[in-house]
Amino acid sequence: MIIFNLNGQQWVDDSCNKKASKIVNHGISHLANLEYAMAYAMANAALLIDDDCQCAKLIKAGATSAAADWGSRKEKLDAVNLDKLNSVEKVWYTMLKATLTADSETYQKTLSDGLIANPESALLNWLSRDAFKYEDNKEFADMFPQLASGSYNMMAYQISRGGNGVEPDLDKAYEMIDKSAELHDGPNIFDTKAEIAAENGDYETALSSQLRAHDYSSFGSQYWQNAVMYWHKLNKERVADNLKKAQVNMQNAILEKNEEEFKKYVSDDESLVVGDSNLGEFYNYTLENLNQEALIDWDSFDIRDIDVYFSSDMTMAYLTFYADGAYTFKESGESVDYNTRASAVWIRTANGWKSIHANWAPTADGTGIPQQ
């Protein structure tokens, strides 16, 4: 049977009933837009309507992994009834089967022969293109304009970045994104827009677009992590200021032996590894160290000139700073001027920024703390 979508084009003339076929074709659109979980869900929906829908089983196989030790693609393919597949479905089945053994020769020959026999198949033309070539994506969009959301998605990247004969053009890239969104209802195109905006330093657009992607699955979404990253990039100065304050507050908590305050800045799941300015061995700093009786009393202690550097994904911060002060030995009463340079590493966790490393060393003409 031939089932046309509302726009007169479909991915595959499948072996499912009329209602299931519409769902299956939407499912392939999700595959083409790298929305595998949604494609899998569409396939399950099709099977609820038509439990003999073999194309839905192929979609589930296409959405899952071919990895032998943990993937379930083989299991999904074993459930397919080959006798009920049409010619295009059989080509797709054989291609998926070849991925189980990384048999690229069989994969490519099956696709090539399948295209010769089915030159107007949208699915096979999609699988045959080089996704990283602008011209291949444009050719598919010209042939199948109503199924080209994935092609417009890839072209948006290629136009925004330029190269391979394509001039970079951000406005045109956003036009490609709009075309993709008009053709397909899914989150990945908004993730694409966010990534392109971020690459061009527009973190406000990146954040708003990423949140649109996240909104498709507000719990457990794969898009949330980047939304958090873009928020941090957009608010980089504020985050840096808060880290500077946290570094000072943490050190004050150590000097005052304030457990509750100190706990705010460390994680129960990560060690705080410290190298003191006495240049002794590195060690894990714990509450036992915090409460240890010291050989000295601090007369003054000030941290200054803090600089903050972030990892590219905004999950880690590196702080460099200097500390000046003075302390007095409890036993002898001797006073010593203290001058060090230091660095600290903080990581972003679900419970906020936490310190995991600090390294202190005396300045060239300075003195650190004594051996404890």
Q: Which residues are covered by each model-predicted region?
A:
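Residue-level recognition of tetratricopeptide repeat
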Residues: 19, 28, 53-54, 62, 87, 96, 120-123, 130, ...
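A solvent-exposed, acidic/Ser-Thr-rich amphipathic alpha-helical stretch
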Residues: 259-313, 322, 337
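Alpha-helical segment of the N-proximal tetratricopeptide repeat
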Residues: 16-45, 49, 90-102, 127
